Amino acid sequence: MSKQNELNARRKQRVRARIKKYGSGRPRLSVFRSSKHIYAQIIDDTAGHTLAAASSLDKDLREGLKTGADIDAAKAVGKLIAERATAKGVTAVVFDRGAYLFHGRVKALADAAREAGLQF
């Protein structure tokens, strides 16, 4: 494993440990960012199930997006994940940014999810 990959894995582990310690049993909104797309899942760690998921690859979003790798796509995914979560009865979550900095696409997704009704 390269040094950078090792550091990213450590940061991801550290963030997840803090979430589990202070999350108080709420589901977590996990974000994965690739070079071409962005993905979001709401995961119930106590049961080990994914409650809702959305990505820039969803048919609902693909037609309206220029690309899946920009801030507009992240905002659309954030809004969609919030709508799907509230439909399942989830209103409060813990944001899991993983190893990513809270900046750019990750921040845009979080802000859009907050505006659409998720609390974190």
Curated annotation (Swiss-Prot):
GO cellular component, one term: cytosolic large ribosomal subunit
Gene3D superfamilies: 3.30.420.100
Pfam families xrefs: Ribosomal_L18p
Annotated SUPFAM superfamilies: Translational machinery components
Gene Ontology annotations of biological process type: translation
Keyword rRNA-binding: yes
Keyword tags: Ribonucleoprotein, Ribosomal protein, RNA-binding, rRNA-binding
Ion transport in keyword set: no
Record InterPro entries: Ribosomal_uL18_bac-type, Ribosomal_uL18_bac/euk
GO terms of molecular function: 5S rRNA binding; structural constituent of ribosome
Superkingdom of origin organism: Bacteria
Subunit structure: Part of the 50S ribosomal subunit; part of the 5S rRNA/L5/L18/L25 subcomplex. Contacts the 5S and 23S rRNAs.
Protein family (similarity comment): Belongs to the universal ribosomal protein uL18 family.
Role of this protein: This is one of the proteins that bind and probably mediate the attachment of the 5S RNA into the large ribosomal subunit, where it forms part of the central protuberance.
Protein name per the record: Large ribosomal subunit protein uL18
